[in-house]
Amino acid sequence: MSLIDPRAIIDPSARLAADVQVGPWSIVGAEVEIGEGTVIGPHVVLKGPTKIGKHNRIYQFSSVGEDTPDLKYKGEPTRLVIGDHNVIREGVTIHRGTVQDRAETTIGDHNLIMAYAHIGHDSVIGNHCILVNNTALAGHVHVDDWAILSGYTLVHQYCRIGAHSFSGMGSAIGKDVPAYVTVFGNPAEARSMNFEGMRRRGFSSEAIHALRRAYKVVYRQGHTVEEALAELAESAAQFPEVAVFRDSIQSATRGITR
């Protein structure tokens, strides 16, 4: 029994593993590669060059690998690369890159991208991230591992969302979000750290306490960023988690959410 519905359209140049399932009315375009165990639902459009790894599931009405609407894009060959064990729910849109940046949009492993979310061109999504319904990432956005963006979160182009961070529903993010920080509002403001997420992921009580102190240094003591970074140096040398927090602030290119 074929795992590809006869009503699906598969370009001859597409490469599908033997056990890939494709539902009715879906279109798998030229230069699309799909790894083993992946399930493509009905009414999905996949456009290449796109590489999709193993054991992913893409639900109905999603558009994956479409050209970017960036006005600079003139049809140059660009890519979308998706890793393994991702779930892409209904109506998600993901665009390929532009040659002005990386020429590639990249999604890692074990991510949940919920209904009607959008991932813009040249964005990079790490591993174990959750993009809740209607989250929209502009172009060139980086989302680090274990970040959670709640429903209707909007992220400005070139922003970086730090590892283990959390955004509240409807947040409008225009600056970098440091690792572990919880933000909320329009415009988004730092509210606390994602301590619940840390506990669920097995962070030690010592590391959480050190991060709590580090947060106060940056956000509660009136320091400039440079002063806060200097004060965090000793703690960062002792706790890798604080080093990640400090590095995410130091490397911010758009300023940090305060």
Curated annotation (Swiss-Prot):
The keyword Kinase is assigned to this record: no
The organism's place on the tree of life at top rank: Bacteria
CDD domains: LbH_UDP-GlcNAc_AT
Subcellular localization: Cytoplasm
UniProt-listed InterPro entries: Acetyltransf_C, Acetyltransf_C_sf, Hexapep, Hexapep_transf_CS, Lipid_A_LpxA, Trimer_LpxA-like_sf
One function term, GO molecular function aspect: acyl-[acyl-carrier-protein]-UDP-N-acetylglucosamine O-acyltransferase activity
Reactions catalysed, as given in the entry: a (3R)-hydroxyacyl-[ACP] + UDP-N-acetyl-alpha-D-glucosamine = a UDP-3-O-[(3R)-3-hydroxyacyl]-N-acetyl-alpha-D-glucosamine + holo-[ACP]
GO biological process, one term: lipid A biosynthetic process
Transmembrane stretches, start-end: none
One Pfam family, short name: Hexapep
Pathway(s) where this gene product acts: Glycolipid biosynthesis; lipid IV(A) biosynthesis; lipid IV(A) from (3R)-3-hydroxytetradecanoyl-[acyl-carrier-protein] and UDP-N-acetyl-alpha-D-glucosamine: step 1/6
Keyword presence, Transmembrane helix: no
PROSITE patterns membership: HEXAPEP_TRANSFERASES
Cellular component GO terms held in the UniProt record: cytoplasm; membrane
Alphabetically ordered keywords of this record: Acyltransferase, Cytoplasm, Lipid A biosynthesis, Lipid biosynthesis, Lipid metabolism, Repeat, Transferase
Enzyme Commission (EC) number: 2.3.1.129
PANTHER family: ACYL-[ACYL-CARRIER-PROTEIN]--UDP-N-ACETYLGLUCOSAMINE O-ACYLTRANSFERASE (PTHR43480), ACYL-[ACYL-CARRIER-PROTEIN]--UDP-N-ACETYLGLUCOSAMINE O-ACYLTRANSFERASE, MITOCHONDRIAL-RELATED (PTHR43480:SF1)
Function as written in the Swiss-Prot or TrEMBL entry: Involved in the biosynthesis of lipid A, a phosphorylated glycolipid that anchors the lipopolysaccharide to the outer membrane of the cell.
Entries under HAMAP family matching the protein: LpxA (MF_00387)
UniProt similarity note: Belongs to the transferase hexapeptide repeat family. LpxA subfamily.
Assembly information from the UniProt record: Homotrimer.
This protein's name: Acyl-[acyl-carrier-protein]--UDP-N-acetylglucosamine O-acyltransferase
